[in-house]
Amino acid sequence: GGPLLNMKGQLIGINSSKYAGVGIEGINFSIPLDTINYVLNQFEQNGKVIRPDLGVTLENSWEARIGLPTKKGVTVKTSSSSSLSNGDVINSINGVEVHSIVDFNKALRDTYSSGSINVIYTRNGEQISTDIVPNLK
């Protein structure tokens, strides 16, 4: 690992691993700076990383899976939540639109402080707003 810098020399992440093989030049993986800052702040405040969890397994749209821009939300694949069901499409978390699982996780991480989380989702064509108290893991 080492610093990942943009063209201006600003730190944007930390290189964490590299995949190389026969006939492959090499693929590098990095941890984004906002994730590093989140983890460091969590350790400073709590002595461990605490993450809100809504008890759902999600599935990206096919557009999001292949990296295309999309306005679709993320689909609930499985749920242990009393509010969300399999097949629901989550559109926003605390007012932040989500179009991929990465967006969902970032919105949870960046907007949750305590109490409940407002989730707007679509079920059978109807848009529904609900507040959910997450499990903290």
Q: What is the predicted role of each segment?
A:
Residues S114-S116:
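Extracellular Ig-like/FN3 beta-sandwich strand-entry sites
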Residues P3, N118-I120:
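Residue-level detector of beta-strand face positions
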Residues L5, L84-S85, T111:
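Short, well-ordered loop/turn sites that connect or cap secondary structure elements
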Residues G1-L40:
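Active-site loop architecture of trypsin-fold serine endopeptidases
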